[in-house]
UniProtKB/Swiss-Prot annotation:
Pathway(s) where this gene product acts: Amino-acid biosynthesis; L-serine biosynthesis; L-serine from 3-phospho-D-glycerate: step 2/3; Cofactor biosynthesis; pyridoxine 5'-phosphate biosynthesis; pyridoxine 5'-phosphate from D-erythrose 4-phosphate: step 3/5
Lineage top rank: taxon: Bacteria
Cofactor(s), names only, from the UniProt record: pyridoxal 5'-phosphate
One Gene Ontology cellular component: cytoplasm
Binding-site residues for L-glutamate, renumbered to this chain: 9, 42
Biological source species: Serratia proteamaculans (strain 568)
Job description of the protein: Catalyzes the reversible conversion of 3-phosphohydroxypyruvate to phosphoserine and of 3-hydroxy-2-oxo-4-phosphonooxybutanoate to phosphohydroxythreonine.
The protein's name: Phosphoserine aminotransferase
Subcellular localization: Cytoplasm
Record keyword Transferase present: yes
Amino acid sequence: MTQVYNFSSGPAMLPVEVLRRAEQELCNWHGLGTSVMEISHRSKEFIEVAQQSEQDLRDLLKIPSNYKVLFCHGGARAQFAALPLNLLGDKTTADYIDGGYWAHSAITEAQKYCTPNTIDVKTSVDGLLGIKPMKEWQLSDDAAYVHYCPNETIDGVAIDELPDFGDKVVIGDYSSTILSGPLDVSRFGVIYAGAQKNIGPAGLTLVIVREDLLGKARREVPSILDYTVLAENDSMFNTPPTFAWYLSGLVFKWLKEQGGLVEMHKRNQAKAELLYATIDKSDFYRSRVALANRSWMNVPFQLADPALDKVFLSEAEAIGLQALKGHRVVGGMRASIYNAMPLAGVKTLTDFMVDFERRHG
């Protein structure tokens, strides 16, 4: 059977070791004779899963003790609403950094609950997309918080700078980059991430919230989105997505076994450098992102002749390179190379790209 590499932007590739372990345990988990999908979320067996997965995540990210970790429903889009409902307090505005599609989506949702101060930081120089440096962001004085997305999956635009905005409450949508390398959690009031890229399967959302920000939710916030309610109930106010939680816990263990986030950072850098080098040394492939803002997780690229796009995708699929079609907004190709994608997968892709150019260039 041909080795398959899944370059989907999400739901994304999961580590094969995790999938194999889940397969082995699926019908008889821990000798119980049942699946982990079938046991009560309030059973001592699942509570052990929940507690261990949180501890492994805390170890990986070195999460300070004054932060709560919440395992939530609803995807990152639910957090677009949860954030203003939980954090505005008596204020009516928040700073929203507009760096691309997902940042703008958060702004659109926030408009239902407050008056966002939208700060457009996108740049385009010589046809290359980029982001203004943080020192040029014009933040307001009275905002409840500052929200930004450090990695835009559609355009492949990244913000590698870490925020240093004094005592401002900073919110980061880390859906596509969390666990791809070390992260100083203490710089943020809230970090949130949908699971389906670097954490686990779709259906789970991670929220890391500083404790002093709890207790400020509006009266009308739905209980399932209230950070204080979720924290007080250990993320079990209602039945959580237990199988997604279990699988995410296996991913956390896998990351620790691989050497942690410093090691993942090295691997991700090597993968991205190989792919970008293949693009840059060719006139056949093109990147539309400025060097300073290229994503390590999502690499869009275009062919010089778009008429060859369908041929490229068809031939790639035939040799096991799946889900390379770019987002409809951008077109072309996109390779998402999250933690679970091995260097061998990227090497197979770049070898194919070189051969495709030789035959069609």
